[in-house]
Amino acid sequence: MKNLYKKKWIYLVLCIFFSVFFFNVLNHLRNSSNSKTFYYTPITPEQFGATGLGKELDTEALQKAINSGSHLVLKSGATYLIDKPLIINHSIKIETSKKNEKPAIILQKNKDSALIFKNDPVKSTYVKQTITPNQSYVVLESTEGMKIGDLLHLKSDKLWYWDNRHYLTKGELHKITKIQGNKVYLESPTSEYYKIKEGEKVTAIAYPERNLELYNISFKHPKPQNTTMLKINYTSNARMEGISVINSKMAGVLLNKTFHTYVSNSYVELGTTKDIKTGYGIQDYGGIGNVITTSTFKKVRRGVDFSGDTPSRYGTVSYSKAFGYKKDTLAVGNSGFGTHSTAEHILFENNYIENFNYAFVTRGNHISIRNNILKGFSRSFVATSYGDNVKIWDNMYESKNGSKLDYFAIIPRQYHGAFTATDNTINGLTGPFIKRNSKDLRYIHVSSNHTIP
């Protein structure tokens, strides 16, 4: 009797085991047939039905390819016609098949962006303890869900010091290097003083580590449109090389709070008109450590601009060229390069500018302008407006077709900071070296400049 009872139990256990086994096998097969394969080896849009002929829409095929892999290779010389923005939400590399040959074209036929990189936050919390400048960590209310490598964006409820427009605030962007309880260590020291004990509120939002690489690709509209072509959000160490952007009148590339983006050997021609108040070739909006180099900007209101709802910091533009129209052709404030409002520790060096109202516009703190060349029809080399610590040295203005500057620098009444201009050469000047309306400068030093009327 006992043996019979034992056999029944063994039979029952075996039945349950095989039932569960076959159920899992069937479930796996069913899920496998419905799931999307994600490729880590190179894939092409043609695998997903794209033609690349510029006649039929390739939007769906491109989007499927983007969703399916981390390395997308476009055909050299192909034109991929799209009617919606391509959306990216994971790390990816997109490049034309042959680096030094004709780039693939992504042609956006509609009045919309061509590409949007999205990176949704993983955590939103608050700063719990006062932060002082040059601090290596911050203490948060919670760190649940955060990881090493995440970006951390701090945003205060206290307005920025200059030209805050009632919504631009103190804040900064960081990368997390260590998490110890509620203490988060940062890759670079903090910039600001946040007085939490005195009632200042600072939100802390974490974004996962995501990377974007774009190589040898042209993004276009058939004709100029009031759009921003590429919208890049919260990336880490993104790289863009050999990119061209054509006919997006508002902005070519928006870098929204990106960490250490590197843009090189790229070309932007927007077709910007006088009604456009932005017209930025590249706009660094609240980023940190972004570098734009060896790139060319045409038909823009400003080649590169640094700003943000919280400050853009430690950005550089070097060895780049900006070609504008004669003065007063575009909207007020047009310049080869510049900053406005929320920008700190920005360097412009070894650049070439033609025309524009100004070679540089500065509205920020610790703005350095060195060894740049301006030619053509402009009002002044530099126009300051709000901020502090503007330093201009070793630059040159050269006359072209009889052109002359009205002034080398304009310092308006709203600028009360420090201003330094040394060792600059001006070949063609009709007015005084500096037009100064501000009567309350903290410091001014002007010396060793060379002027030819």
Across the structure, where does each feature detected by a protein language model lie?
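N-terminal Sec-pathway targeting helices
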Residues: 2-15
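Parallel beta-helix/beta-solenoid
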Residues: 69, 89-91, 93-95, 110-111, 118-158, 171, 207-222, 232-247, ...
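N-terminal extracellular ligand-recognition/capping segment immediately after the signal peptide
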Residues: 49, 59, 70-112, 156-172, ...
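Consensus "Asn ladder" position of solenoid repeat domains
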Residues: 217, 243, 266, 295, ...
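Autoprocessing Asn-cyclization modules and mimics
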Residues: 101-179, 185-188, 193
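Right-handed parallel beta-helix/beta-solenoid
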Residues: 30-61
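Short glycine/acidic-rich loop motifs that flank beta-strands on beta-rich extracellular proteins
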Residues: 83-85, 104-111, 222-229, 249-256, ...
